[in-house]
């Protein structure tokens, strides 16, 4: 029987997966269409993407349910299939491991709107949408729930509460930070800095604090965020940085950091104390494969160092 996710990361850091949205588009999803619905209509294509991540070495696969709340799915007239879509997302991610041990992290992204008094949704409506989604993910066997790409503490807190109410065995809260133009610091779109976010998530009952996406959040800035989390918080940290800085090419935003370039930051990320390392915008299975290689080299180096220290102590 495999250990719980929060127990496994105390043994050694785990490797997450990479971007899903861009991989879906490469597989044929048209811009503006509902990628989450592919869990039901094109499950073999979703499975093929996640299997490539698993084969690249991912220990954790995040479900294809980022926009899987009934509020988000309503934009595509799919709200009534929210439970079905989320359950299928877990089942597909589990299949990607091909029977080997691995962790499925159920994905809950932003609900896509604003709450009162600035928008049309009440906190109760958002909470119920997240609770329904989290419940479906947990019932299908997700090992953890991640509330990700959050910019406001209010929505993040509602998501954490909903996941806990649904009985999630592990709850991950993940903020998206934007780097300032001079690169000196970063905050969420709503002005939340890493220290405030980490303290909030720990107090709210998250099991793991995380960061993902955000403008300019490359490996180095993500490493800084990990260090800032760990300076004020006792919880494990997960990071999913982007593949470099965004660039505008032919009126499209692209991330052009190669797998080898991005993987050069793995050692520093591990030294900063990250417990789960994945990747976000612009990343591919090849990036994750490069991460796996660097992480395995790190673990082997640690093993040899430990053996040498033990031998010296016995002389």
Description of each model-found segment:
Residues 1-315:
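Domain-level signal for soluble alpha/beta catalytic cores
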């Amino acid at each position: 029987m495999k250990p719980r996710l929060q127990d496994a990361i105390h043994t050694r850091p785990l490797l997450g997966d990479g971007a899903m949205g861009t991989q879906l588009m490469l597989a044929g999803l048209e811009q503006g269409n509902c990628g989450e619905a592919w869990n039901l209509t094109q499950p073999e294509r979703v499975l093929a993407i996640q299997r490539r991540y698993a084969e690249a070495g991912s220990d954790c696969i995040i479900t294809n349910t980022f926009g899987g709340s009934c509020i988000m799915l309503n934009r595509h007239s799919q709200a009534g299939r929210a439970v079905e879509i989320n359950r299928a997302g877990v089942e597909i991610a589990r299949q990607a491991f091909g029977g080997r041990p691995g962790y499925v992290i159920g994905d809950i992204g932003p609900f896509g709107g604003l709450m009162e008094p600035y928008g049309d949704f009440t906190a109760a409506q958002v909470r119920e949408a997240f609770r329904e989604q989290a419940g479906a993910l947990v019932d299908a066997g997700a090992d953890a729930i991640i509330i990700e790409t959050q910019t406001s503490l209010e929505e993040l807190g509602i998501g954490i509460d909903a996941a806990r109410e649904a009985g999630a065995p592990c709850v991950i809260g993940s903020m998206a930070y934007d780097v300032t133009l001079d690169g000196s610091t970063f905050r969420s779109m709503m002005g939340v800095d890493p220290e405030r976010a980490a303290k909030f998530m720990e107090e709210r009952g998250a099991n793991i604090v995380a960061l993902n996406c955000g403008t300019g959040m490359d490996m180095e800035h993500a490493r800084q965020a990990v260090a800032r989390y760990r300076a004020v918080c006792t919880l494990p940290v997960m990071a999913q940085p982007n593949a470099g800085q965004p660039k505008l090419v032919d009126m499209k935003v692209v991330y052009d950091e190669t797998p080898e370039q991005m993987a050069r930051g793995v050692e520093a990320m591990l030294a900063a104390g990250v417990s789960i390392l994945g990747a976000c915008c612009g990343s591919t299975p090849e990036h994750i494969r490069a991460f796996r290689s660097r992480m395995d080299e790190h673990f082997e180096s640690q093993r040899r160092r430990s053996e040498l220290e033990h031998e010296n102590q016995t002389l």
